[in-house]
Amino acid sequence: MPAVTGKLAAASLALALIAASASTASAQKKYDTGATDTEIKIGNIMPYSGPASAYGIIGRTEAAYFKKINEEGGINGRKINFVSYDDAYSPPKTVEQARKLVESDEVLLIFNSLGTPPNSAIQKYMNSKKVPQLFVATGATKWNDPQNFPWTMGWQPNYQSETQIYAKYILKEMPNAKIGVLYQNDDYGKDYLKGLKDGLGAKAASMIVLEESYETSEPTIDNHIVKMKATGADVFINITTPKFAAQAIKKISEIGWKPTHFLNNVSASVGSVIKPAGFENSQDIISAAYLKDVSDPQWKDDAGMKAFLEFMTKYFPEGDKLDGGTIVGYGVAQTLVEALKKCGDNLTRENVMKQAASLKDFRTEVLLPGIKINTGANDFAPISSLQLMKFKGEKWDLFGDVISADAGG
């Protein structure tokens, strides 16, 4: 009997050890809704239709990039299930799609949804649900507010910073400028306008001769451009989305107006704005960049650009490589993958935000040299540097230094 007892004791000890190791393994793995041993479910909302549909290519690029990641084994062995819906850049529709993603699809997080009004419409909802609204595709300053909105984080340089850089340039190079501003009549446009005024400081009132707003429902902004020229403005600040940016460039040429033209970064795509507007109409436009430009020959031997072009050829051959949206989608998707890798087996929503807020000197393959991604518990603005550029021939030429442009939030 003693031998049998010994065997039973050994067997029960072995079972206890197996149970203990299993519980240790499960203790190490933490999941919230949307994550399992095999999958990470990520939601996204894009304007695949409507007035801002040019940006839909960002979502399509992200879907292709996650397909690449899945083919390469996923993130820590988990495949990405990317669920992307159309909101037509309509905030009520964004709310509907966000609820669907969170409550029906049960995603772990919503990633890189596009537009200031759409994201503003779901910010309180996302924070009340404690679901990450991560790396939103808008540069509004309000996304850098971890104290009041700890579940919302931006990605690109903020709009106020960008127009502050333009203001500094104008004050230095054109101190007697008469400035006309065309801006979209929503949070997006007003954020840019505030940055410009803050950058001009006391001179804003005397230098700005016209502030003209437009609605996204307008079919054309031609009348606003004609009105702008009539003021005698010699500097034009163009705060628009791609469709209207291209219209403005064409109309300025058509009526023979020759201001120094500043075009906001989000409408500086060669593929979706400059080319349709006409290269001949776009000469000497000034903008700012934080990402490499595919059309710029200086990057032809760059390892990061080569990797991007190989990705496009293999995973998104129908995508326009010249469209700035493809570079954006690629860069922001790489940033999300980095944050999720850092989560390890702790895929709770809280840890996703913690890791997203712990990025140090991270570089995607498509950021300009000297620009890095840094976040912290009190810094939800991953990218805060830009470089000025001028359109020459069929491409943007960078000039000056990389400028750090932190504006409060």
Predicted regions mapped to residue ranges:
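Extracytoplasmic "Venus flytrap"
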Residues: 31-63, 85-92, 114-115, 182-191, ...
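Immediate post-signal peptide segment of exported/extracytoplasmic ligand-binding proteins
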Residues: 27-44, 71-79, 171-178, 346
